[in-house]
Amino acid sequence: TATGHTTAILSSKVKGTAVYNSGGDKIGHVEDIVLDKESDHIMFAALGFGGLLGVGEKYAPVPWSLLSYSKDKGGYVVPMSEDQIKAAPAYDLKELVKGDGEYGAIREKSYDYYKVPHYW
């Protein structure tokens, strides 16, 4: 537009954004975004779920390509159920980046679980 890019967003604004399934049920939130600094890709969103007030919460690394922003919901929608997210590989946040996610194993497990083609 003449006034600037209207779809740009800071990653700090994405953190905490609600995530919904395609049925409209809230299934979690974006806790953080993991970047691949060598390939310029967003690896995944760390989708926080479970736990109470952050205690016992786990993080499912969901490939970024699966998240679609919904203006109506003011959050992201993923094409899966809450049960599918709960059954997905889940980790502590620090594990997602330690040794490049244990040398890529976390990234590979995540992309394979969600049947998303590898970009690497």
What kind of region is each of these model predictions?
Residues T1-W120:
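Peripheral interaction segments used for macromolecular assembly
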